[in-house]
């Protein structure tokens, strides 16, 4: 999914500050972001924000739906570019058709992951299929480390098997959890998994204590380490925990995502659909997209590519790190 804001702000994401991580659970609330047009979808964005810009290398999290396609028109994101990141698409309902400039043509369905590596430059389109009535899912981005940010663009698709737990199940789409490991490739250690909890269940997950973690709740009355996390909120825990204890106090099943990774040691600039290290790198990527260079062509999409928004009048520069 593209960041289709017409005036996207730059976000400078800083390396972790020295010192002992704060204990407890930090709750990050989402902001509503319309994706353009009077009938367009509105997403709930929890990353990046001023309170926290990264969880591991996870740098972007949009949560959308359940969205009635008959009212909103569904998803129709024209070809657009990416550099310096990987996109991760995960659905709860509906189907999205993916096309990209390396020739990939794939469908993503509930319980399946599409991972696209932008690297030096890729373009793609995303369109909900005609048979989709309800569209519901998440779009996530992962920042690539400096030594891999110019890697060749690529695409992977994987269908993780459900792993039963006492009180629920997980599907691991990136990294390792509950004895299962995803084969999907990443350039930094990461965790990405969907978990469902039975009504009234408490589940304790063994996790890497070197990771910071985020729990994004989709549905249910969820508590993480005793702290209430409402739907659409993202709960953060600092490194140092070897377990995450999740409870569903609702009379219906709960669904959530568990994200994680070691603190990302680099500063990055995010603007529009680009992740870079400097103002000049972002400017060059925008110019290349406008000229039709570098990003290839998406075949099979009926429509024009997305135009790049105007850059701000001042150079993209660091923002003060809140934490």
Regions inferred by a protein language model and the residue ranges of each:
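Jelly-roll (double-stranded beta-helix
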Residues: 1-323
């Amino acid at each position: 999914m593209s960041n289709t804001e017409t005036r996207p702000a730059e976000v400078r994401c800083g390396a972790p500050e020295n010192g002992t991580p704060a204990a407890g659970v930090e709750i990050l609330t989402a902001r509503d972001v319309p994706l353009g047009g009077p009938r367009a979808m509105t997403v709930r964005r929890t990353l990046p924000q001023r309170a926290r810009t990264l969880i591991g290398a996870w740098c972007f999290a949009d949560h959308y739906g359940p969205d009635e396609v008959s009212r909103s028109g569904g998803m129709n994101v024209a070809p657009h570019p990416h550099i310096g990141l990987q996109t991760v698409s995960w659905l709860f309902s509906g189907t999205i058709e993916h096309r990209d400039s390396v020739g990939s043509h794939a469908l993503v369905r509930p319980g399946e992951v599409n991972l696209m590596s932008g690297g030096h430059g890729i373009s793609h389109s995303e369109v909900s299929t005609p048979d989709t009535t309800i569209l519901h899912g998440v779009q996530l981005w992962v920042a690539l480390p400096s030594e891999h940010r110019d890697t060749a663009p690529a695409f992977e698709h994987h269908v993780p098997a459900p792993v039963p737990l006492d009180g629920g199940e997980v599907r691991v789409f990136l990294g390792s959890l509950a004895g299962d490991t995803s084969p999907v490739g990443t350039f930094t250690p990461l965790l990405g998994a969907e978990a469902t909890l039975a009504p009234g269940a408490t589940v304790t997950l063994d996790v890497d204590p070197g990771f910071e973690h985020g729990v994004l709740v989709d549905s249910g009355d969820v508590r993480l380490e005793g702290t209430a996390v409402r739907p659409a909120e993202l709960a953060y825990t600092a490194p140092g925990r070897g377990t995450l204890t999740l409870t569903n106090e609702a009379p219906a099943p709960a669904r959530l995502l568990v994200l994680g990774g070691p603190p990302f040691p680099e500063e990055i600039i995010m603007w529009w659909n680009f992740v870079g290290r400097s103002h000049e790198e972002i400017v060059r990527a925008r110019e290349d997209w406008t000229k039709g260079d570098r990003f290839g062509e998406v075949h099979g999409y009926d429509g024009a590519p997305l135009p790049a928004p105007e850059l701000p009048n001042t150079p993209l520069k660091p923002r003060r790190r809140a934490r």
